[in-house]
């Protein structure tokens, strides 16, 4: 047995499923998950000593590549001053100033410890600010594991949501309406059914948890218009897209102004950080200045703030996002070319430093139904053959891939060459 197999066997006796987040268990592709020893730049190194070109990037944060010296040094320096104080620090102020400067729609920002905390808190704030209970989310979008978000669509577009996890009370789920991503008709129907009850829409501007689905041109502006028409708030969940699709996020890339924004992943530079913020009048409703409660023992942790501050300063340097886009475009085009040579039907969506690979005969993939019609079994074979080639993709047909500026042209070319060999075997 490999060392990864031995560790996985031991882990399953001690940790549910052997992992601390379900997708890591390889249940979406089968087999034994890799246990990682270290990472540097664009590469992961497993406990058995094998190197992989990494397109998971810790599920998004590693936009600069692994073990970036500026972030590593910032963490070391902060740790030498203390690990946690439970009191305000100068770095929290500097971090808030940096974030609000980089994302102009955020007049104020509150730091938390995860993307789930950010979305959960933003929704509570929207409900408190509007005095309404219902929310709209989209089928196939993921916003963390808060109870109100673990909800699937009912039997029709206007039926109340149903829990999609045991432990979520139906009374919670009934306030969540699930619409179809990239379909404004379904959203308008929900508002017309409940015109005075919907507090907010929460949306991934690029859906990254049904692989990678960019918005149609009219979708995000249409959501903004519907929120304005019916008095609801628009929450854009940029946990995945923030500082990746563009410096000011996908909201800037697509030209839409939210009321609240949720951030995570890149904002922590690899440390556990989330944030939410937006309009000053809305944020003023948050405790201690307002009645909507939110708190966190480790929120604004000095080491996490130091890591995030260092990361964002690097990400804000000229040329970063142009490089990300060029590398991702080169990879997407190369994969499509290699697939065509092998007569493999393939769609590759990409925007900024995100991409998604779909085995499908369709010309495009734009919504959850399109994703579910793709060939998941072929993806599973593709994943494992690429892993044998030393390329680590997301171990699920429903997760986006991530590029970093640490990836080289050689890494991209090697990945395309590996895919060419794999396509020949499919």
From Swiss-Prot:
Main location: cytoplasm
Annotated PROSITE patterns: AA_TRANSFER_CLASS_3
UniProt keyword annotation of Transferase present: no
Names of required cofactors: pyridoxal 5'-phosphate
GO molecular function per UniProt: glutamate-1-semialdehyde 2,1-aminomutase activity; pyridoxal phosphate binding; transaminase activity
CDD domains associated with the record: OAT_like (cd00610)
Reactions the enzyme catalyzes: (S)-4-amino-5-oxopentanoate = 5-aminolevulinate
Pfam families: Aminotran_3
Subcellular location(s) of the protein: Cytoplasm
Pathway named in the protein's UniProt entry: Porphyrin-containing compound metabolism; protoporphyrin-IX biosynthesis; 5-aminolevulinate from L-glutamyl-tRNA(Glu): step 2/2
Keywords for the protein's UniProt record, in alphabetical order: Cytoplasm, Isomerase, Porphyrin biosynthesis, Pyridoxal phosphate
Record-listed E.C. numbers: 5.4.3.8
Keyword Isomerase applies: yes
A single cellular component GO annotation: cytoplasm
Modified residues (N6-(pyridoxal phosphate)lysine): 265
Single GO biological process annotation from the record: protoporphyrinogen IX biosynthetic process
HAMAP family: HemL_aminotrans_3
Family: Belongs to the class-III pyridoxal-phosphate-dependent aminotransferase family. HemL subfamily.
PANTHER family: GLUTAMATE-1-SEMIALDEHYDE 2,1-AMINOMUTASE (PTHR43713), GLUTAMATE-1-SEMIALDEHYDE 2,1-AMINOMUTASE 1, CHLOROPLASTIC-RELATED (PTHR43713:SF3)
Oligomeric and partner information: Homodimer.
Protein name: Glutamate-1-semialdehyde 2,1-aminomutase
């Amino acid at each position: 047995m490999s060392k990864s197999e031995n560790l996985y066997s031991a882990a399953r006796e001690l940790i549910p499923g052997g992992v601390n987040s379900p997708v890591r268990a390889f249940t979406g592709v089968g087999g034994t998950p890799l246990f990682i020893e270290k990472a540097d730049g664009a590469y992961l190194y497993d406990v058995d000593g094998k190197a992989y070109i990494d397109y998971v990037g810790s599920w998004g944060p590693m936009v600069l590549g692994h073990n970036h010296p500026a972030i590593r040094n910032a963490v070391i320096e902060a740790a030498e001053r203390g690990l946690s104080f439970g009191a305000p620090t100068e770095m929290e102020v500097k971090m808030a100033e940096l974030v609000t400067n980089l994302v102009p729609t955020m007049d104020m920002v509150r730091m938390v410890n995860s993307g789930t905390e950010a979305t959960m808190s933003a929704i509570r704030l929207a409900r408190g600010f509007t005095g309404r209970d219902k929310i709209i989310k989209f089928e196939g979008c993921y916003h963390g594991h808060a109870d109100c978000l673990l909800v699937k669509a009912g039997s029709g577009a206007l039926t109340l949501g149903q829990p999609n996890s045991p432990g979520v009370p139906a009374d919670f789920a009934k306030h969540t309406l699930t619409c179809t991503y990239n379909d404004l008709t379904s959203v308008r129907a929900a508002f017309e059914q409940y015109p005075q009850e919907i507090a907010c829409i929460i949306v991934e501007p690029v859906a990254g948890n049904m692989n990678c689905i960019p918005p149609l041109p009219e979708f995000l502006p249409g959501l903004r218009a519907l929120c304005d028409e019916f008095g609801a708030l628009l929450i854009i969940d940029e946990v995945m897209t923030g500082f990746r699709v563009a410096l000011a996020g996908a909201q800037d890339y697509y030209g839409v102004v939210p009321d609240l924004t949720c951030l995570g992943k890149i904002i922590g530079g690899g440390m556990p950080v989330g944030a939410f913020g937006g309009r000053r009048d809305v944020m003023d409703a948050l405790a201690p200045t307002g009645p909507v409660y939110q708190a966190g023992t480790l929120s604004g942790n000095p080491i996490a703030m130091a890591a995030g501050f260092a990361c964002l300063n690097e990400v804000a340097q000229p040329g970063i996002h142009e490089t990300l886009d060029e590398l991702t475009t080169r990879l997407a085009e190369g994969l499509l070319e290699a697939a065509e040579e092998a007569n493999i039907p393939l769609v590759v969506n990409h925007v900024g430093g995100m991409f998604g690979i779909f085995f499908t005969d369709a010309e495009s993939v734009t919504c959850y139904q399109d994703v579910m019609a793709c060939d998941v079994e072929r993806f599973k074979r593709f994943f494992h053959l690429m892993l044998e080639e030393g390329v680590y993709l997301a171990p699920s047909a429903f997760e986006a891939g991530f590029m970093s500026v640490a990836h080289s042209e050689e890494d991209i070319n090697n990945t395309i060459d590996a895919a060419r060999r794999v396509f020949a075997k499919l």
